[in-house]
Amino acid sequence: MNSQLLFDDLAQRGLIAQTTDLEQLIALFRQPQTLYCGFDPTAGSLHIGHLVPLIMLKRFQDAGHQGIALIGGATGMIGDPSFKASERSLNSAETVAAWVNALATQIQQLMTPHLTQPLVMVNNADWMQSIGVIAFFRDIGKHFSVNAMIQRESVKQRLARPDQGISFTEFSYSLLQSYDFAQLNQTHQCALQIGGNDQWGNIVSGIDLTRRLNGTNVHGLTLPLITKSDGTKFGKTEGGAIWLDAAKTSPYMFYQFWLNCDDADVYRFLRYYTFLSVEQIEQLEATDKAQVGKPSAQRILAEEMTRFVHGQAGLESAQRISQALFSGQLNQLNLAELKQLEQDGLPCRQLAHVSDVVTLLLETGLASSKRQAREWLENGAIRINGERWHELTLAQTFALYDQYYIVQRGKKQFAMVKLAQV
């Protein structure tokens, strides 16, 4: 892709928050270049907030450049203080090492099917662990002005909180990230670092250190921090983060998350997260606004993102579950799909046995009293495993795979019961 077209597309998508000299950057990327983004191991999985920078690496790779994914085995031992309200809890070396391996595997498994050339994977512990503390302070620390560092907004906010402040450990984080850029420039000729807009200060420090150590000019580009139209952080639900690991967030719940995206956000997220052209997204928005009824943008966003993260099989499974809950044809679900619902798709209670339906409705919270439960049954408001239910008793042989009952009240109230295995 033409360099100008690449950066024009990023701008039209709203993916450029801040950048060093844009004209210089466009000129530089007329030839194949290397860029990187860092991911600190703060958990054993990435979440959807990490998808935009990962997808950004793919956008550059599709244009003929080489992306590097840096896993912060060293920086993850400290934690980035940028715009954090309080000091991070430190994790053990064993925990961080396990998370480093998990993230490296996850990024490779996630991104490789979408790339003709795989991302280069690096771990900053590989070079940081070989530097002695005296050498680091002498050779790296001397290039940093404390006066300048404490003027950063992220540091000033912490210093303004007398109950929190900032430790020397976290204050030094910027030096480590800056050295990463200089190291990758030296070993991989890396010319650009990308990251969230909260990383701008660290990126600028890395640009300056690289110039001082290597005598080369490098660049930075930040992505907007993803928020919803109401200003709240995107990617969180009442149940917590939306993870990319299917064992932490099932493909069904992942699909539902995107499907429930607000109308005020969906077209912006299509620009950020998908590879639909800006023209296609604009046409979709115009079509949705012209027709009466539910817009199709959420469905397209959910399909694109679930396919990207969980593959076609994961998407089809999520769609089967959604359709089965809507139609009541729950016997069409396989055991793995029922386990997705058990994991995080429906409120699930585990019971030793089930025979009394009134008790079942009370245990699942679908009725608040025995009288109410009987009324729901008499009025035909209850379905069990898709069948309208009037009886007061229930045989275990009716359980799906001898384990599961899915109980429905009305159109939208669902609960799940799993029978304890003897």
UniProtKB/Swiss-Prot annotation:
Its EC number is 6.1.1.1. Pfam families: SYY_C-terminal (PF22421), tRNA-synt_1b (PF00579). L-tyrosine binds at residues 36, 173, 177. A motif ('KMSKS' region) lies at residues 233-237. Gene3D superfamilies: HUPs, RNA-binding S4 domain, Tyrosyl-Transfer RNA Synthetase. Its main location: cytoplasm. Keywords: Aminoacyl-tRNA synthetase, ATP-binding, Cytoplasm, Ligase, Nucleotide-binding, Protein biosynthesis, RNA-binding. It comes from the Bacteria. GO terms for biological process: tyrosyl-tRNA aminoacylation. It catalyses: tRNA(Tyr) + L-tyrosine + ATP = L-tyrosyl-tRNA(Tyr) + AMP + diphosphate + H(+). Residues 355-419 form the S4 RNA-binding domain. It is found in: Cytoplasm. GO terms for cellular component: cytosol. The keyword Protein transport does not apply. Belongs to the class-I aminoacyl-tRNA synthetase family. TyrS type 1 subfamily. Homodimer. This is Tyrosine--tRNA ligase 1.
